């Protein structure tokens, strides 16, 4: 089955992309992902001065289910790429030469300086990459240099920096947005005003993964200390779905969305597509499951399309958006459907502590 989709004029063999991070940290791992069947990849974020980037060890932390030990949450305090830009430029050229039909998106980040943003845009663009993703959303480390989410949390900066890039970019530009904000629509719309062709959402959620009760130190612990980091994996998916749906309902129709956040299965990916994502990105899932997880993604999407009668991936995008409403309308529709008696169980005076779990199950839809 044809799983291709064209987004911002770029044809993706399928809608599944490696998300920016360790899975796209050099040409070798990018090549492995393409060989495995991924439709595209967003490389690890690059900047002009890698010497300022110093990563620490350990830099990851896991939140596990108390029932079976499964990883349901993942924190990282990893920074952007620490490899020289000159090395990246050579590898971008190499990857595009060897995989001309696979999409390569360059993630870029710089300090608040027009000349630096435009220089980075020019030199990376000359390598033949297919699109840019502007990292306005890394929540840790880089913010100390007024980078990452320090820009994405301020719509005026988001719009201005996007416009700087668009002045020199000849390829599509996506802006990657932070969830660490009250209203994700505001900076996203600002990026569109600045000329962004698409929005990627969401990046990780600022977090502390836990505290070691033996040492009393928060984790991940580096020489006895830590910093808050970015939270990802399964547990963030509902938050990401909410924000993606909000963006899909608010952005101009021509603005594409690349959905990110807790995607590990084809079921997850399809949910994002139904809520407006043309492509989906997976980073933590690949770190935990490996690049071969793309097999299930493709097989599951193809089966879903066959079962539901979809003729193209594009037909899926945004299909579930019309079913969002307001709470007042939900009450009205329930009453019109003569189901209001079923709702009586939700009244406060119907609840009793002895059967709270039973009442909870009674009012749950899945």
Which role does the model predict for each range below?
Residues 50-67, 208-228, 286-310:
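C-terminal helical cap(s) of enzyme catalytic domains, especially alpha/beta-barrels
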Residues 259-262, 281-283, 289:
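Helical hairpin unit composed of two closely spaced alpha helices linked by a short loop
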Residues 44-46, 136, 203, 284-285:
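Short secondary-structure boundary segments
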Residues 1-105, 109-114, 118-119, 297, ...:
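N-terminal capping/small domains of soluble enzymes
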Residues 273, 287-366:
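C-terminal extensions of enzymes
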Residues 31-36, 40, 111-258, 267-277, ...:
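Alpha/beta enzyme core
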Residues 27, 82-89, 114, 155, ...:
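Electropositive phosphate-/nucleotide-binding environments in soluble metabolic enzymes
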């Amino acid at each position: 089955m044809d799983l291709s989709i064209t987004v911002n004029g770029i044809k993706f063999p399928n809608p599944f992309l490696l998300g920016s991070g360790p899975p796209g940290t050099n040409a070798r791992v990018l090549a492995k992902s393409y060989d495995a069947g991924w439709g595209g990849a967003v490389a690890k974020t690059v900047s002009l001065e890698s010497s300022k980037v110093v990563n620490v060890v350990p830099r990851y932390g896991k939140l596990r289910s108390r029932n079976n030990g499964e990883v349901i949450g993942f924190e990282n305090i990893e920074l952007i790429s620490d490899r020289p830009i000159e090395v990246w430029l050579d590898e971008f050229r190499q990857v595009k030469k060897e995989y001309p039909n696979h999409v390569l998106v360059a993630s870029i980040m710089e300090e608040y300086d027009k000349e630096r943003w435009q220089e980075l845009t020019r030199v990376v663009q000359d390598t033949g990459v297919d699109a840019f993703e502007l990292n306005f959303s890394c929540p840790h480390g880089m913010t100390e240099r007024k980078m990452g989410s320090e820009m994405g949390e301020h719509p005026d900066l988001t719009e201005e920096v996007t416009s700087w890039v668009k002045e020199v970019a000849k390829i599509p530009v996506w802006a990657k947005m932070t969830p660490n904000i009250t209203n994700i629509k505001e900076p996203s719309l600002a990026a569109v005003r600045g000329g962004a062709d698409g929005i990627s959402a969401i990046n990780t959620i600022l977090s502390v993964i836990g505290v070691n009760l033996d040492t009393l130190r928060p984790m991940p612990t580096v020489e006895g200390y830590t910093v808050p980091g970015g939270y990802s994996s399964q547990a963030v998916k509902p938050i990401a779905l909410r924000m993606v749906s909000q963006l899909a309902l608010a952005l101009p129709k021509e603005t594409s969305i690349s959905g990110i956040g807790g995607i590990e299965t084809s079921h997850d990916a399809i949910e994002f597509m139904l809520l407006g994502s043309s492509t989906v990105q997976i980073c933590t899932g690949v770190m935990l499951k490996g690049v071969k997880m793309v097999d299930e993604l493709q097989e599951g999407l193809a089966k879903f399309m066959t079962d539901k009668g979809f003729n193209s991936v594009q037909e899926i995008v945004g299909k579930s958006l019309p079913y969002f409403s307001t709470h007042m309308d939900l009450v009205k529709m329930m009453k019109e459907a003569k189901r209001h008696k079923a709702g009586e169980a939700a009244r406060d005076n119907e609840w009793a502590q002895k059967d709270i779990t039973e009442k909870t199950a009674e009012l749950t839809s899945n």
